[in-house]
């Protein structure tokens, strides 16, 4: 059977290459034996064939077994001429081992010759010699075989099996940081975004900074990535030095395409001193990005992770575990299964394909996250929850940038799980950013959530890209969806100072919002913040202050599946709802050294969830308003009022700016003091020390 397969392959090669013999231009010039050096190009094929056959005939010594058994039959030889001109035997198909050994002996005596060439460059070629044993006497051919020729006589023919030169003809160009001019998303990282935030917010620029992630091509107009990277190059000369400190591991560039490929890690070791728990995270990843033509770009990353975190983090993950027996949901990452009885295993993959038909449009299909706002937090849409499938359309012209995003989300609670499948729901967002003046920008936001009820699936009514869905919601039924609207604004006082704001209104009811009676329908929130670049004249020092305030019941819904959540996490603010929060942030980077300091002070309200008090106080986006504590008199942080403090310091070194590989150390101090200790919310403090090496491709949120 094996011999049959080989014969079949050789037969196919014979048939294919017999045709190729008529087109010498496929490798332009045959290999040249010394005795063929004076032949014309057209005569080299015949001279090569005759010389190979003559060397075989003149040196071949017939094994005794051939005459003893009066054997007559085929002897097929497959060989190559490499780029250095060495002739190497690849395979012999013969009935006797002695025949194979004799052919090998003969080919060992073949001289080194001038290799075949294509476009003047040496190229690799293969050939098949079909002989019949006994060989008889050598008779030179007088012309090269042609396609129509039928073998007669002894059948001792040599057929050129040259490799198609198309592979060698592929252009191999030098990678020139094409990613910085591409329509690939810049990975969401608060520290990395702070590096080019000053350039994007110069007075007089027509940039739009709320819709994130940014495309490299958007930012590159204001911030020269190549220049910045060149300023911190280590100029290592060895291959390993360049790849480790300055460059992507693998780069490929051709005529109309480019690709980079990199391994990565997120390795952490630490300790939660208050519970005496050793923590770790072991993430291995590989990511690739590239471009095909001028209009298509892509990015993809695959993570394989195991981890055990500080006690408060682990409890948070377990509390949000999905139906079906999985151990938890890692905040911002995804569903995790149990690993070694006390840890989590949470694989994940993200990526996107980006299509830019013109300078005014960009379309993306991906699995990842989006963010709307200029702050550390967002009340409109943040990257707090797990990645999700999305389709996004960005339209940019004049002083306007208009973003439409359609998302597929999941409700993983046991109450809505059917036959082991999580409940699917959909979200459609519109955000219109308008630069009114060279200093002032305003944004209009709208979002609607609907579920797959009555086999409704993805409701095409929400494909309408024109902002405000409210009329559509009523046309599909009063309980057909949950709509939110919002506003944002930013004002640039100087090139170094700007202020920003957001307002979210969930289920707008003017009488309840402005009535002043604390209606549960007053579901609003706002954000105020400011940034100061190169603060106090220190280049690279970035200061930010932010205040967030969200009333109880905001983002929730009487039909819980229609809330503003995904995978048991908020799609907006990390703290969910029913809180006030002040954040102070300082960031600094000098060349490759960086540091971050963050302090958060908040007042939060939770449910008691006890037999004596099971009312819904509006402290969770997954509560049902049908069980609300009161229609009126609802106050901020009501219920189990909790004082929350979080401080975090991180310092590190950027190992490789091309891949965002960093080494760092961090310490977190967290203080959580509820008014009443319950099973879920009880007084605790955490001091969490961490050391790590990380490829920085997403934001970790530990501040909840």
Model region roles, listed by residue range:
Residues 3, 346, 440-704:
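Exposed, low-structure sequence patches enriched in small/polar residues
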Residues 7-15:
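Bacterial N-terminal signal peptides
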Residues 111-112, 263-269, 667-670:
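Generic short beta-strand segments
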Residues 79, 91-94, 129, 135, ...:
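A mature extracytoplasmic/lumenal domain signature
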